[in-house]
């Protein structure tokens, strides 16, 4: 058994001892978590008719609160033990990273679930005729978007249905307008009615009794800025200082002037010539060279620069013999005669001089 296997066995023994010590708290945590989900399912599945008729579904908020208290108590006990164990043995997550991760994930889920239940509870009264809108009458969900009925529409007339076969889109805009959600990509449980209230910011839910908030998106107010009148007297002073420093900069600084395309090309050619001045030491006749080996280099990458920072011979040959440079800085008569092999397909050559 190597040191890795021994470390895994040690961690497994520590996690087993930790879960044995926290057996009661873990069981209470799991039981409370399941009861919260079960009770929340009753709330989320409840419609307006169920809310009115208590004989269909019985909802008890006190039961849910007791489950939440048990969940929080067991959560604090587990996290407190792991934190104390972490400080004692100096191990990450108190020696049981899996348990700490599961507790954290369950806590986040319960918090989001309770937030959804709060919106759902507030929304239980809103489908009424006096406090808000009724879903599927002046609020419709189609194609991933919520559509609101325009305030000037008469509810007694026949309204167009939102479906894939309705072709007159312009007519729909006379009746409905889209609602911009605060979190378009947020996934919420329940039907579109729950998604509608779950995606609202908290400020809009608190004042949701105001029907105008649902009818229109108010235009943001104009930005008002108060500028003191004395700044009009300071503008010439600032302009004068700016012009003075600008003149000093133009007189004493060496700023590069913009180059034309032709001048930039000439400068590039001169730089290349200076870099190759010490490389070319005369031409070698092709008859005095003998190829030792030949290898196809189609698949071999050829870098532009060597490790010393110098350009490779192939790149130098390509630059010197570039048609763009002929007639400008390197006349055609001054271009060195290059072996014909270098002008064919890429190949690697090794040469030796017969005279030596």
UniProtKB/Swiss-Prot annotation:
Domain of life the protein comes from: Eukaryota
Q: Specify the DNA-binding region ranges.
A: 183-199
Which InterPro entries does its entry note? Answer: MAT1-1-2/MatA-2/Smr1
List the GO terms this entry assigns under cellular component, sorted alphabetically.
Answer: nucleus
What GO MF terms are annotated?
DNA binding
- A Pfam match: MAT1-1-2
Q: What is its main location?
A: nucleus
Q: Does the keyword Transmembrane helix apply?
A: no
Q: Its biological function?
A: Transcriptional activator that is required for post-fertilization events. It is required for the developmental events that occur in the female organ after fertilization.
> What family does this belong to?
To N.crassa mta-2.
Protein name listed in UniProt = Sporulation minus regulator 1
Name the source organism.
Podospora anserina (Pleurage anserina)
What gene codes for this chain? SMR1
């Amino acid at each position: 058994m190597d040191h890795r296997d021994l470390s895994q066995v040690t961690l497994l023994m520590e996690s087993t001892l930790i879960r044995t010590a926290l057996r009661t708290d873990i069981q209470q945590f799991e039981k409370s978590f399941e009861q919260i989900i079960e009770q929340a399912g009753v709330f989320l599945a409840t419609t307006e008719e169920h809310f009115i008729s208590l004989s269909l579904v019985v909802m008890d908020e006190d039961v849910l609160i007791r489950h939440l208290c048990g969940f929080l108590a067991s959560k604090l006990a587990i996290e407190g033990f792991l934190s104390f164990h972490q400080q004692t043995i100096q191990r990450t997550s108190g020696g049981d990273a899996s348990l700490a991760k599961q507790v954290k994930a369950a806590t986040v889920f319960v918090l989001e679930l309770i937030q959804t239940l709060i919106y759902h509870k507030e929304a239980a009264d809103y489908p009424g005729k006096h406090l808000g809108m009724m879903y599927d009458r002046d609020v419709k969900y189609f194609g991933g978007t919520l559509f609101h009925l325009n305030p000037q529409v008469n509810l007694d007339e026949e309204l167009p249905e939102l479906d894939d076969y309705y072709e007159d889109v312009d007519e729909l805009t006379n009746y409905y307008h889209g609602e911009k959600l605060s979190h378009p990509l947020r996934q919420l449980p329940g039907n579109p009615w729950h998604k509608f209230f779950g995606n609202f910011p908290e400020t809009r839910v608190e004042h949701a009794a105001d029907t105008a908030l649902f009818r229109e998106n108010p235009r943001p107010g104009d930005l008002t800025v108060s500028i003191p009148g004395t700044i009009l007297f300071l503008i010439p002073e600032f302009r004068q200082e700016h012009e003075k420093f600008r003149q000093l900069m133009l007189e004493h600084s060496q700023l590069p002037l913009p180059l034309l395309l032709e001048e930039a090309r000439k400068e590039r050619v001169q730089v290349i010539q200076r870099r190759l001045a010490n490389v070319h030491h005369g031409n070698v006749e092709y008859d005095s060279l003998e190829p030792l080996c030949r290898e196809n280099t189609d698949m071999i990458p050829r870098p532009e620069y060597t490790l010393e920072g110098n350009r490779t011979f192939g790149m130098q040959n390509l630059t010197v013999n570039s048609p763009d440079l002929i007639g400008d800085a390197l006349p055609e008569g001054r271009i060195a005669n290059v072996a014909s092999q270098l002008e064919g397909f890429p190949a690697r050559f090794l040469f030796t001089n017969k005279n030596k």
